A protein has these predicted regions:
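Short histidine-centered loop motifs in beta-beta connectors
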Residues: 144-147
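Residue-level recognition of short loop/turn positions
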Residues: 108, 150, 196-197
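A sequence-level detector of short linear motifs
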Residues: 113, 155, 201-202
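Loop/turn elements at beta-strand to alpha-helix junctions within RNA-recognition modules
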Residues: 65, 149-150
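Pseudouridine synthases involved in rRNA/tRNA modification
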Residues: 1-12, 18-23, 137, 159-222
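Short beta-strand segments enriched for Tyr within beta-sheet-rich domains
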Residues: 71, 152-160
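RNA pseudouridine synthases
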Residues: 1-123, 129-135, 206, 212-219
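Trp-centered recognition loops
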Residues: 139-142
Length: 222
């Protein structure tokens, strides 16, 4: 499988991760993005963030330990901006909505919304913006932009399901009726400082599912 490069220089490489491909895997018989990128650049690479296997979109790697350290520091300090595109079930009443919850991971590899006082509870925050909807659809669906403010396990899927707008195709957090093909979730845009020259880097991938709702790639700056 040939990887799709979005950006590359001497210090970093950004690629598109298709839905269904693991970011990393311990199974030798399964393809994963880390191995494919390492084979492409013919040197060790350092994964900066992860995407769940059903999720598509932008994936960032460093080509050296020094570059990785700089990017990981930005990630830990919340300085890497992450914007997602998703299709959710239903119609959002508010054009822009901020969600703040506490969530925790379960033994079944799921996450649930919980109380702040619960053991292992972690703060989860994001901002959702309505972009377009299918007004003639029998079951209304809405394209949204999501600014991910914290990076928790299955965060977007859990929080959107929690307000009654599960992601289309979400077999874990949606209802049986929601199981329509692939999960409609894409890591659309990353904004970060280059680890060597400190210039602002913006990388994007516009997914096919979004093109059914809008004609050009959106500018997400909320």
């Amino acid at each position: 499988m040939k990887i799709e490069k979005i950006y590359e220089d001497n210090d970093i490489i950004v690629v598109y991760k298709p839905a269904g491909i693991a970011t990393q895997t311990a199974r030798l018989t399964e393809p994963d993005m880390e191995t494919m990128v390492r084979n492409e650049v013919k040197k060790p690479v350092f994964l900066i963030h992860r995407l769940d296997q059903p999720v598509e979109g932008v994936l960032l790697f460093a080509k050296s330990k020094e570059a990785a350290a700089g990017l990981e520091k930005q990630l830990q300090n919340g300085q890497i901006e992450k914007y997602y595109l998703a299709v959710v079930n239903g119609d959002l009443e508010e054009p822009v909505l901020r969600l703040d919850n506490y969530i925790k991971k379960t033994k079944e590899n799921k996450s649930v919304i919980c109380e702040k006082s619960d053991k292992d509870a972690k703060k989860a925050s994001l901002i959702v913006k309505k972009l377009a909807d299918q007004t003639n659809a029998e079951n209304k669906k809405t394209l949204v932009g999501i600014h991910l403010l914290t990076g928790r396990h299955h965060q977007i899927r859990v929080q959107m399901s929690g307000i009654g707008h599960s992601l289309v195709g979400d077999k874990k957090y949606g209802t049986i009726k929601d199981n329509e093909g692939a999960l409609k979730l894409c890591n659309y845009c990353l904004i970060f400082k280059h680890p060597t020259n400190n210039k602002t880097i913006t990388v994007k991938y516009w997914p096919e599912f979004a093109k059914e709702y809008i004609n050009e790639a959106p500018v997400l700056d909320f």
